[in-house]
Structure formats: C-alpha cells, structure tokens
Design a protein with these regions (language model features):
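Hydrophobic alpha-helical membrane-embedded segments
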Residues: 1-11, 78-91
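Interfacial segments of alpha-helical transmembrane regions
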Residues: 1, 62-80
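Core segments of transmembrane alpha-helices
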Residues: 43-54, 74, 132-137
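Interfacial loop at the N-terminal end of multi-pass membrane proteins
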Residues: 1-49, 97-119
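Conserved, charged catalytic cores of large soluble enzymes
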Residues: 94
Length: 151
C-alpha cells in the first residue's frame, strides 16, 4: 500500500501539476503542499509497517523460529527510505524549498522550465525511494508464504 501511494505521487500527481500551471511560483507552491502532506502520511505508514515487521520478527525469535531474521530484514528494508530521504533527497528538497520561499517574497528569477527540471529530478529520486518499502513488502510476503507452506 505504501509503495503504491508513493508511486502515484511521481507518476500521477507530478504530471498533473505540470499540466495545470504555467507559473513557476504556482508549481513550487503546489510541490510544497504535496511535500507537506506526503511527509506527514508516508513516513508514518512506513514506520507502522516497519514496526509490524519488527514485532513479527521478535515473536518468531522468541518462539525459536529461524524465519525471524527475514521479517527483521523486511522491516530494515522498509525503513531505509528515511535515511535515503535525509541523505540523497535532502539537497533537492532544500533547493525546492529555497525556490518556494523566494517565490513567496516576490517575483522569482527562476523559469518554469528550471522548476520543472528540478521537480522532475525529485520525482525520479522519489521513485527510487519507493523501492525500499516495496522490497520490504516482498521480503515480508515471501517470508510469510514460506512459513505458511511449512518450509
């Protein structure tokens, strides 16, 4: 669920933003609001899923089941989106925030094309960030299926 919601931002929302404004200041404002809502909900979902994986891992470890490490790995893969955001995406985020702040003060010297290029780069960094919860989900699913089949 987290991955699908996250991917929809890059593949649906960002193109809609591109197609509905021709003012760089408006595009920056829309991106800022998108980021605001995304940063509230997406990490919370990721932390919740990570917590569930770690809870399952702890339960399996307590019952001496070897599969616990796979659930822990699923949790670790899922939460890796947080350091990725802080390390890899922060420079792009900060550039967009600076441009957005500049646009709030008055007319900006940045062109629509420049803003679109930065947001396009951000959208692809965001797609890469989606890989972490997806991998976590796949590891968790495969672990569950293997355990359910009695292996």
């Amino acid at each position: 669920m987290t991955t699908g919601a996250m991917l929809s931002i890059s593949f649906i929302t960002v193109p809609v933003l591109y197609n509905t404004t021709d003012a760089p200041s408006q595009l920056l404002k829309q991106w800022s609001r998108l980021y605001w809502y995304g940063h509230i909900y997406m990490p919370a979902m990721s932390v919740a899923v990570t917590g569930l994986f770690f809870y399952i891992a702890a339960q399996k470890r307590a019952s001496k089941k070897d599969i616990w490490s796979r659930y822990a790995m699923a949790g670790a893969a899922t939460i890796t989106m947080v350091p990725y955001t802080l390390i890899v995406m922060a420079p792009t985020n900060n550039s967009l925030f600076a441009l957005s702040d500049e646009a709030l003060v008055g007319p900006s010297s940045v062109s629509l094309k420049e803003v679109q290029e930065i947001i396009f780069g951000w959208a692809w960094l965001h797609v890469a960030r989606c890989v972490f919860p997806f991998v976590g989900s796949m590891i968790g699913l495969m672990s569950f299926m293997q355990e359910s089949m009695g292996h």
